[in-house]
A protein has these predicted regions:
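Bacterial N-terminal signal peptides that target proteins for export
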Residues: 2-11
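Bacterial N-terminal signal peptides
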Residues: 10-20
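Transmembrane beta-strand segments of Gram-negative outer membrane beta-barrel proteins
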Residues: 23-35, 50, 55-59, 106, ...
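Signature for the C-terminal beta-barrel architecture of outer-membrane proteins
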Residues: 25, 39, 69-71, 102-105, ...
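Surface-exposed loop and membrane-interface regions of Gram-negative outer-membrane beta-barrel proteins
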Residues: 57-94, 121, 308, 315
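Outer-membrane beta-barrel "beta-signal"
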Residues: 95, 198, 505-519
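Acidic-aromatic/histidine active-site loop/patch
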Residues: 226
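C-terminal structured "cap/appendage" subdomains that terminate the fold
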Residues: 463-487
Length: 519
């Protein structure tokens, strides 16, 4: 077959077309340190940002190494097909098309904020709260038109889409904006890390880097199922007659007839615990102007799954939440929401999928003899009985410089008392606040501080619980394109299950200090 004469023009044209694209690439680098799993690692990172048209691509190419020069291998693991997939996905910080509110918008990668509708199920969800300890690559998309709006999200493609949800809203029903939402977490255990790929999460795996073993009852470094283990529970009494036992001469010995064994850990490939929910909302716009609007709305949600009674351990079906009346308004630089809320039968939480969800999704406690017990967020909903109350939120843009946001949720009703071992009448309150610098001031390039305290009798006592998270971000310019970036986040885990936060082992700090530069 005759080859075209001008085929040589193809690479030339490709090179010409690539010049404008390459000229738009923003090459960014960073050096510094970061805390991962309680250990400080040095980092060298390249983060190019590639904009073209409505598209934007940001990569995150980073190497972590410790003081001995050991490289943190999780980000560069090519040991299996699954590891290769996750390693390649990790390099994407985001791929974006358009912006929220556009006719078509999509973003793959880091999700800093996701809301569905008025937020009865999903409000301020983020998959970045454990970054860089956990790098999640999710999806958020919108399809907007005059008659119908579609939006959805996925938390992480690396866990093969564990959490996902969506909402469809339309004005074709009675001429009012009506929305239908659905959210599902197909396996709440998928948020647990499994380094060796044996299906047993690290927190329950006594050999997190060896996929052949996972249980070591006495903690002597020899697995219970290892032929070399002759005293499983470490009580000094031989479990079996075996010539491989050091010093064994064939003489009769007393055998252990009461061997304590740790329980088998869950297998992420076989064990699952899902939860689902759906919601319906209806709005009614009262006033619609450029700088002033007021709307009324109502919404109801039903959660589908099983929780447990905190006293008896009885399995109970999840409940529903109802907002009979809500008000949404915008006046100038301020936005305001007010809701009257009801939980008729308990076993429900408003804004269940929130900023803390990836941390609260599965908790663990250490019992006697270091026995690990996992508790999903769903399993703890049994401590909430019938409740009523209100919710208020204010977002204020203070000129072009600052944005302040605060919300307060005040419910009253039946709540389980750990000390009295019964349901009592008490308050259930939530407080969230954040302050963000929108425009650089002198050498301060950006700044943000936030605090969240959920589901406590009084959030203004500022007593830390598992529902607390706080942090800040700060960027200071030093000239010549150099910026010092400081990020700090603190959350908490009740490791011993006593209902209180105490000690460093129940505090989770994530700190990143780096100097970034552009070239």
């Amino acid at each position: 077959m005759r080859r075209p004469r001008n085929i040589f023009l193809i690479p030339i044209l490709a090179g010409i077309l690539a010049v404008p694209l390459l000229s738009q690439v923003q090459n960014r680098g960073a050096v510094g340190s970061v805390t991962i799993d309680g250990k400080v690692w040095n980092q060298i990172a390249m983060r190019p940002v590639i904009p073209f048209g409505k598209w934007g691509v940001a990569l995150d190419l980073v190497i972590y190494f410790d003081a001995e020069g050991n490289i943190h291998a999780d980000e560069w693991d090519f040991s299996s097909s699954k590891a290769i997939k996750n390693t390649l996905i990790d390099k994407i910080y985001y791929i974006r098309y358009g912006f929220p509110g556009d006719p078509i918008y999509g973003k793959i990668g880091a999700l800093d904020r996701v809301d569905l509708g008025y937020g009865i199920l999903v409000s301020d969800y983020a998959n970045t709260m454990l970054y860089p300890q956990q790098r999640k690559v999710g999806l958020n998309f919108e399809r907007n038109s005059k008659s119908i709006n579609i939006e959805g999200f996925v938390n992480d493609f690396k866990e093969n889409i564990g959490l996902f949800g969506g909402r469809v809203s339309t004005r074709k029903i009675m001429g009012l904006p009506v929305g239908f939402s659905f959210v599902a977490d197909r396996n709440q255990y998928l948020g647990l890390k499994d380094s060796d790929g044996d299906g047993r999460p690290n927190v329950m795996d006594d050999f997190p880097d060896n996929n052949a073993w996972w249980v070591d009852t006495d903690g002597d470094g020899i697995a219970d199922n290892d032929p070399a283990e002759w005293d499983i529970d470490g009580d000094g009494i031989t479990d079996t007659l075996d010539s491989r036992i050091p010093g064994y001469t064939g003489d009769p010995v007393v055998l252990d007839t009461d061997i304590f064994r740790k329980g088998e850990p869950i297998n992420l490939s076989e064990d699952s615990d899902n939860i689902m929910a759906f919601a319906v909302d209806v709005g009614y716009p009262l006033v619609t102007q450029d700088k002033f609007s007021v709307s009324l709305y109502t919404q109801v949600a039903q959660m589908i799954g099983q929780t447990v009674h905190p006293g008896t351990g009885e399995s109970l079906s999840l409940g529903m939440g109802l907002v009979p009346i809500g008000v949404s308004s915008r006046f100038g630089p301020a936005r305001f929401n007010f809701e009257y809320r009801m939980i008729p039968d308990g076993r429900f939480e408003f804004n269940y999928w929130n900023r803390l969800y990836e941390i609260e999704r599965t908790r663990f406690t250490k019992g006697k003899k270091n026995q690990i017990t996992l508790k999903t967020k769903e399993s703890r909903l049994g401590r909430y009985g019938e409740q009523k109350g209100y919710f208020a939120r204010m977002i204020l843009n203070m000129g072009s410089m600052l944005e302040a946001s605060t919300s307060y949720h005040d419910m009253h009703g039946q709540i389980w008392s750990v000390s009295k071992q019964e349901f009592i009448e008490d308050k259930n309150q939530t407080f969230l606040a954040s302050l963000q610098l929108k425009k650089a001031i002198s050498k301060i390039q950006y700044a943000r501080v936030f605090y969240q305290q959920r589901n406590v009798p009084n959030p203004f006592k500022f007593e830390y619980t598992e529902g607390t998270i706080l942090g800040y971000q700060l960027g200071i310019a030093f000239g010549q394109g150099l910026v010092l970036n400081y990020t700090f986040r603190r959350s908490f885990r009740d490791v011993n299950g006593d209902g209180r936060i105490s000690g460093k082992n129940e505090t989770i700090d994530i700190t990143t200090i780096e100097t970034s530069f552009s070239f």
